[in-house]
Structures are given as C-alpha cells and as structure tokens.
Swiss-Prot record:
Compartment(s): Cell membrane; Apical cell membrane; Basolateral cell membrane; Secreted
Gene: FOLR1
Keyword terms of this UniProt record: Cell membrane, Cytoplasmic vesicle, Disulfide bond, Endosome, Folate-binding, Glycoprotein, GPI-anchor, Lipoprotein, Membrane, Neurodegeneration, Receptor, Secreted, Signal, Transport
Family affiliation: Belongs to the folate receptor family.
GO biological process: anterior neural tube closure; axon regeneration; cardiac neural crest cell migration involved in outflow tract morphogenesis; cell adhesion; cellular response to folic acid; folic acid metabolic process; folic acid transport; fusion of sperm to egg plasma membrane involved in single fertilization
Bridged cysteine pairs (disulfide): C37-C65, C57-C105, C66-C109, C89-C175, C96-C146, C135-C209, C139-C189, C152-C169
Organism for this UniProt entry: Homo sapiens
Chain sites annotated for binding folate: D103, Y107, W124, R125, K126, E127, R128, H157, K158, G159, W160, N161, W162, S196
Lipid sites, type GPI-anchor amidated serine: S234
This protein's name: Folate receptor alpha
Signal peptide start-end: 1-24
Length: 257
C-alpha cells in the first residue's frame, strides 16, 4: 500500500513539473519574443500608437516601434537615418524604390520581429534581425519591380565608399542591372541585407510568413506569424498538447496501479 502511494506521488510530481515547464516556456515566448522593439539606432524602447506615421509606414500606426519623424525620413533619399543613397547607380525606378521604403518601414516600425532578433556587436546597433521568413510574393514582386534599376553590389550592408558622407560605389564596382547582381528573387531578398530575410515557401495570408505589405483595416497579419514562431521556438508550438497527453497517461497508470 505504501509503495503504491509513493508511486502515485512520484507520478503526480512528474505531471506538475512537466506542465509547469510548458507554462514557463509559453510565458517566456510571450514576454521576450512578442510585441518588442529592436535595440537599434532609431527604434523606440517599446511599441505603441503613432497616429501620424508617414505614407508607407502608416500600416503600423496602431502599434509601432518607429516615431513619426523616423517614418518621414524613411521616405527620403540620403536621409539622416543611415545616409543611404538609393540612387548610387543613377535614378532608381519609383516602383523599385517603394519596396525599399517598405522594407525600411518594416524594419523600423514592426513590433512583430522578435523571434528573429539577434544580438550584434556593432557601433550603430546592438540587435539585428536574421532570417525573417519573408512571404514569397513580396520578394518576387520586389525583384520584378527592380529589374530596370541599377546597382553595383549584391550586399548593401558593406563595401561602400562613405568618404562623401553617403554611400557611393567602390572603385572597380561596376553599375549593372539588378538582375546581374541578383539573378533570382531569392538572391535579392536573402543577400541584400546579409540574410536579414530568408524567402519563405509560404504565401501571404498563410500565417507562416512575414508580409512586408498589408492592409491595416484587416489587422496586422504579422502578429499571428510572430506568435506561431515564438511558440515554436519556446517548445510550445505544435507540441503544446503533449503535457496533457502525458498527464492522461500518468493518470491511467495511476488508476491501473
């Protein structure tokens, strides 16, 4: 009798530990990976409403990591944000430039990139994003709209001549059509910002990839995406039901013992 009670007590303790661990992981995912801002050059400490966000950054106005001023600067050539010159190989086509503006808005404003934030040791930022699963249609359209524009590099994070205060092509770096340096949409989106993005096989609306473009009237679809990946990273995603199944098995053992 005493042995049976000891066994039952041990089973109960195991059940409590398992369920407790699962709840801890879920809580960690919610606080550390969701609704957060990067520790970077222009980001706010915490996301919040910004009613006057400018033009292409407006989809994030209900909950943003960027200020109104940052959103305005995101639309300018050689803005104070990073002194980056989109027209380094002649005038960039407006259809192409709008993708880079949207890319900047997503980077500066989105509070839904937590699952992909990584620490870095750089003078201008302490954190970056890595391998954000960008919806394939957003990447394909970006590449298509930039086919007629020119550039001189495949990695825009490094290798520029900054002596004039903004980026210019390095000596010997020839200006070529985008498709010369970016032969496919995947190369463009994965390589241009040193793997900040990783093109997803999922489509817009799937809940499994980050949308650069969305209609705020329909809500922010990237919130669901962030929750999915945060849960998966915390070990509480598709396996969230296993504590219950284990507890059920333990209870059966208890009854049969």
């Amino acid at each position: 009798m005493a042995q049976r009670m000891t066994t039952q007590l041990l089973l109960l303790l195991v059940w409590v530990a398992v369920v407790g661990e699962a709840q801890t992981r879920i809580a960690w995912a919610r606080t550390e990976l969701l609704n957060v801002c990067m520790n970077a050059k222009h980001h706010k400490e915490k996301p919040g409403p910004e009613d006057k966000l400018h033009e292409q950054c407006r989809p994030w106005r209900k909950n943003a990591c960027c200020s109104t001023n940052t959103s305005q600067e995101a639309h300018k050539d050689v803005s104070y944000l990073y002194r980056f010159n989109w027209n380094h190989c002649g005038e960039m086509a407006p259809a192409c430039k709008r993708h880079f503006i949207q890319d900047t808005c997503l980077y500066e404003c989105s509070p839904n990139l937590g699952p992909w934030i990584q620490q870095v040791d750089q003078s201008w930022r302490k954190e970056r994003v890595l391998n954000v699963p960008l919806c394939k249609e957003d990447c394909e359209q970006w590449w298509e709209d930039c086919r007629t524009s020119y550039t001189c590099k495949s990695n825009w994070h490094k290798g520029w001549n900054w002596t004039s205060g903004f980026n210019k092509c390095a000596v010997g770096a020839a200006c070529q059509p985008f498709h010369f340096y970016f032969p496919t949409p995947t190369v463009l989106c994965n390589e241009i910002w040193t793997h900040s993005y990783k093109v997803s096989n999922y489509s817009r609306g799937s809940g499994r990839c980050i949308q650069m473009w969305f209609d705020p009237a329909q809500g922010n679809p990237n919130e669901e995406v962030a929750r999915f990946y945060a849960a998966a990273m915390s070990g509480a995603g598709p396996w969230a039901a296993w504590p219950f199944l284990l507890s059920l098995a333990l209870m059966l053992l208890w009854l049969l013992s």
